[in-house]
Swiss-Prot record:
GO terms for biological process: SRP-dependent cotranslational protein targeting to membrane. The keyword Nucleotide-binding applies. GTP binds at residues 287-294, 369-373, 433-436. This is Signal recognition particle receptor FtsY. Belongs to the GTP-binding SRP family. FtsY subfamily. One of its GO terms (cellular component) is plasma membrane. It holds the Pfam family SRP54_N. Residues 32-67 have a biased composition (Low complexity). Keywords: Cell inner membrane, Cell membrane, Cytoplasm, GTP-binding, Hydrolase, Membrane, Nucleotide-binding, Receptor. It is found in: Cell inner membrane; Cytoplasm.
Length: 488
């Protein structure tokens, strides 16, 4: 969506306020300056008028932004051109607040308990005060309202996290401190069992050794292998840790956690492939059945749409009618376009015709699902080769990315799956699902070391917001239970 540019500059530190109690007046921002009109975005007939104290929504029906508002519900300030007290109070609160997404959202939602006219007007006023383009603001509010209605969410407590996630994506603020903190918390919770498997054993190792010696390395090898890091990656990792300890000139076990964290950060620093393409960007989703590929496609589509992209999903797994139906349901839920043929159709034909549709209808992103039948390895490889060939013929450079979806709970099987698909069609990125609650999180280290393929997203739950960009530093800290070293 690309709005809030002034606020993004403030958050990213391009402009620092001289006095922390008085935020900088960002260019073009009425919140950090002074509102000239005090009017919310959108005054068209289809938009509900602002309300100071509207009646709550009916228990069984959520008032959406599309619902009409009775004439007698329009407050005095809308009739006489004044500014309602809540607008003045909200503007002042936002100006004085710390420029963080969760803090600002807290002020916007202050006194709002459920979805309805009050929420829509406060969001519109918030956007208007930031001089957000009216059409973009209205699209955001409308789509969020429709999502609430579809999910049958009514109370703020049920959807606040989703609202913050949508704002973070729309603002490109996932690296903002609040969002990093939320992700770190999810990672820490999700890796609890893996951390217990590795962390507690490392604690015992450190407590039982006065210095880092051969016995120390032998015990560490056993710990890592038991944590699903695997024999070969463990051997490589210990070799690199030995060298790191030697360069640091230390044999003090107290330094070991920090050395391991630093090494893991290096391992996870594989550069992501960036392909400059003319739209649509074409992404091939691959992986065995049952790893969460369908929901991953839905979550990728959902993220892309919240970032302002038009998304088409193609059902390339034609060997299971249920797979086509399930993907269509998810496409409808997230509001993405959908293309499929009947069960048993040629997957390459589906990809080719979906490419036609994506080009002719102006889609920005095409996500192509594929089958994952490991018991027919030869046929699978041939099928993937054919899909890549027809996509490239139709749209030069396509597919621009091949994303492998792996289930973290499968442990060492993830390595054989990565090897198979990398040989079949090449893997550019990996999405690791079901990382929450597994004791086999060490497989992340194994995959990164053995193949050097960047892990771009991790699944930390069932909600749309629970698939987040992978950050190697955060993962290492959450895995080992160590804090980030403060900058010098």
């Amino acid at each position: 969506m690309g709005f809030f540019s002034a606020i993004k500059r403030l958050w990213k530190g391009d402009t620092a306020p001289e006095d922390v109690s008085k935020p900088v007046e960002a260019e073009g921002s009425a919140i950090v300056g002074t509102s000239s009109t005090g009017s919310p975005v959108g005054t068209g007939a289809a938009m509900p008028a602002a309300q100071d104290a509207p009646s709550p929504a009916a228990p069984h029906a959520i008032a959406t932004p599309d619902d009409a508002v009775p004439d007698d519900a329009v407050p005095d300030d809308a009739v006489h051109g004044g500014e309602a007290p809540w607008k003045t109070e909200l503007t002042l609160a936002l100006r004085q607040a710390e420029p963080r997404l969760s803090v600002w959202l807290g002020h916007v939602l202050d006194g709002v308990d459920e979805a309805g006219p009050i929420l829509w007007e406060r969001l519109r006023f918030f956007f208007s005060s930031l001089e957000v383009p009216a059409d973009e603001a209205e699209t955001f509010v409308r789509d969020f309202g429709r999502w609430l209605e579809a999910m049958e969410y009514r109370y703020v407590a049920d959807f606040r996290s989703e609202l913050q996630y949508r704002l973070a994506l729309a603002l490109d603020l996932e690296d903002e401190e609040d969002e990093r903190s939320r992700l770190m918390l999810k990672l820490t919770e999700g890796l609890a069992r893996t951390r217990e498997q590795i962390g507690r054993r490392i604690d015992g190792l450190l407590a039982s050794h006065g210095r880092i010696d051969e016995g120390f390395w032998e015990e560490l090898e056993e710990i890592l292998i038991m944590a699903d890091v695997g024999f070969e990656p463990t051997t490589q990792l210990i070799g690199r840790l030995r060298e790191r300890a030697r360069k640091a000139g230390t044999d003090d076990p107290a330094r070991f956690r920090e050395l391991l964290r630093e090494e893991l950060e290096v391992i996870f620093r594989a550069p992501r492939r960036i392909a400059a393409v003319n739209p649509p960007e074409v992404v091939l989703l691959i992986g065995v059945n049952g790893v969460g590929k369908t929901t991953t496609i839905a979550k990728l589509a959902y993220r892309a749409q919240l970032q302002g992209r038009k998304v088409l999903i193609a059902a390339g797994d034609t060997f299971r009618a249920a797979a086509i139906e399930q993907l269509e349901i998810w496409a409808k839920r997230v509001g993405a376009g959908f293309y499929a043929k009947t069960a048993g159709a040629d997957p390459a034909a589906v990809a080719y015709e979906a490419m036609d549709k994506a080009v002719s209808e102006g889609y920005d992103l095409l996500l192509v699902d594929t089958a994952g039948r490991l018991h027919t390895k030869a046929n699978l490889m041939e099928e993937l080769h054919k899909i890549r060939k027809v996509l490239g013929r139709k749209h030069p450079g396509a597919p621009h990315r091949s994303i492998l979806v792996i289930d973290a709970t499968t442990g060492q099987n993830a390595l054989s799956q990565t090897k198979l698909f990398n040989e079949a069609c090449g893997v550019d990125e990996i999405v690791l699902t079901k990382l929450d609650g597994t004791a086999k999180g060490g497989i992340v280290v194994a995959v990164a070391m053995q193949f050097g393929i960047p892990i771009t997203y991790v699944g930390l739950g069932e909600k749309m917001e629970d698939m987040r960009p992978f950050n190697g530093s955060d993962f290492a800290m959450a895995l080992l239970g160590v804090e980030e070293k403060p900058a010098a």
